[in-house]
């Protein structure tokens, strides 16, 4: 018979008391919201970033009785992104992690063959879905913990032409490449202990995926 061990509460994720910036919550079906619930259950302090006051207000009930910490920032607006640093400093925020779950593509006219994609649509998708990761990291570099973990949500099919996903495939491929370049630049210029990773999810039923034709 083994020697009985005293009960020990495990903290597998080791997130208790950590401050995490969560982006990309659109509604309860968002991947970002599912991740946020796990983070909260693990004891993390969550700060939610929304694109607009209207989107924030729409989700306040979901976040819990209006007590959630939130900020508004449209990542297409350079002035708003630049304003994140003084906002974080004013609120004494040091982020142990960032969840980047921001993506957009204009499929209002359906999925076109890739060679027919409109330049403005492609560049907008690249700005929102890819460049925003670098922009957020740069804006908040002084507000990151020395061992901060930055995670972005990608897809599992950037190496194949999934036609129903349209031009977001190349955009997500650019996001994957940005991850390794960000890891290199942040560890050399900000802190050698910062980590940057991408999670390539398989197809999931979300409000975002509902907008993908086919």
What is each PLM-predicted segment?
Residues 42-58:
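Conserved glycine-rich Rossmann-like NAD(P)H-binding loop of the short-chain dehydrogenase/reductase
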Residues 63-79:
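Rossmann-fold cofactor-recognition segment
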Residues 76-91:
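Conserved Rossmann-fold cofactor-binding substructure of NAD(P)-dependent oxidoreductases
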